[in-house]
Structures are given as C-alpha cells and as structure tokens.
C-alpha cells in the first residue's frame, strides 16, 4: 500500500474532514531505505518528482571521514555504535544522519543522509 503524505483526514476533535479534491501523485511517499552496514556498497537510483533522480544507499561498507583540519579519508565501517533516531537502529546496524559509527580510524558521527544522498560522510570524534 502506498504512503500518503497529505493532510490528515481527522480534526483534532476526532471528526472527519471531507477533502474538496482527490489525492495527488506528488503527495505519495516511499518506504525508508534503512541503510545497513554491509561488505559492499549497494545503491538504488530512484526517479523523483519532476523527473529528477535520487541515489539511495541501501548498504554501506565505506564512509568518507573528515578530521578537524578538513582532511578526508575513505575508511571501512565496522558497526553502528549508537543512533539517536532510534535505539533499535544501532542494534540492527542501520545508518542515518547523526549516527555514531565505528570505523577503522575511530568513532565518527554521520553528517550526510545516506538514504537521500547515496553516500556516508562523517566527522571524526575526539576520543
């Protein structure tokens, strides 16, 4: 079943709102990509509104980690340590923006949105 991102059909009192129009295609949503830690990167290209394209990262093996000086390195992701979006995501190794990941060079905080950008960018945390 499709995900609809239009206004709710219920009033705060619980009464029903009758729409003056049909649902529009632009109001459709999609399931979250739930980017997982894996052995290999896996991407999906999706057609979006206006014929544009969005790259979804469904499985991630590497992250671009930047230090305080701005120097970046491509390093392997080992696991997700914690995720403020949902504490179950850390247990399931799901990467979202703000997640703390363990990499080869230490802990890093994810700054990109892997399900929207198609890449994992992170900043190295001071120990």
Swiss-Prot record:
Regions that span the bilayer: none
Protein's GO biological process: translation
Record bears the keyword Ribosomal protein: yes
CDD domains in alphabetical order: Ribosomal_S8e
Keywords: Ribonucleoprotein, Ribosomal protein
Cellular component terms per the entry's GO annotation: ribonucleoprotein complex; ribosome
PANTHER family in the cross-refs: 40S RIBOSOMAL PROTEIN S8
Subunit structure comment from the entry: Part of the 30S ribosomal subunit.
The protein, known as: Small ribosomal subunit protein eS8
Organism of origin: Pyrococcus horikoshii (strain ATCC 700860 / DSM 12428 / JCM 9974 / NBRC 100139 / OT-3)
């Amino acid at each position: 079943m499709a995900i609809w991102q239009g206004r709710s059909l219920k009033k705060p009192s619980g009464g029903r709102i009758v729409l003056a129009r049909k649902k529009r295609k632009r109001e459709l949503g999609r399931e979250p990509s739930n980017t997982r830690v894996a052995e290999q990167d896996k991407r999906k290209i999706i057609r979006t509104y206006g014929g544009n394209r969005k790259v979804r990262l469904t499985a991630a093996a590497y992250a671009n980690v930047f230090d305080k000086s701005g120097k970046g390195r491509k390093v392997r992701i080992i696991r997700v340590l914690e995720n403020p979006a949902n504490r179950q995501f850390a247990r399931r190794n799901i990467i979202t923006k703000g997640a703390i990941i363990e990499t080869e060079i230490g802990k890093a905080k994810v700054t990109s949105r892997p399900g929207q950008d198609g890449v994992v960018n992170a900043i190295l945390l001071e120990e």
